[in-house]
């Protein structure tokens, strides 16, 4: 998958080799209350590399001050869904599947 962190229509961070969590931490520190978007790469084969979101993703958002997560419905693996939603709710993080 691919992650980008944005605030007020400005890109704070784009995921590189360091991975999703490092991108979130870097971007969130540059723009508090930022939005994290996690999507599949163009022409990505869902059989081999599915974008994933879990409690570690939400923990990184909490640590960096990001306030919303946007994921691609039907193309993102949400592990431990109940725990992810509860943790996000507890910390005021909105999750949108589009």
Task: Please identify what each model-predicted range represents.
Residues 1-58:
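Conserved mixed alpha/beta catalytic, RNA-binding, or beta-rich assembly cores of soluble enzyme
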Residues 59-98:
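C-terminal binding/interaction regions
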């Amino acid at each position: 998958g691919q992650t980008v962190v944005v605030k007020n229509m400005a890109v704070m961070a784009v995921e590189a080799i360091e991975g999703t969590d490092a991108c979130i931490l870097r971007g969130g520190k540059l723009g508090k209350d930022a939005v994290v978007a996690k999507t599949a790469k163009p022409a990505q084969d869902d059989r081999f590399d599915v974008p994933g979101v879990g409690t570690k993703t939400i923990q990184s958002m909490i640590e960096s001050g990001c306030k919303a997560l946007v994921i691609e419905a039907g193309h993102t693996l949400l592990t431990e869904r109940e725990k992810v939603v509860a943790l996000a709710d507890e910390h005021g993080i909105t999750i949108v599947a589009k």
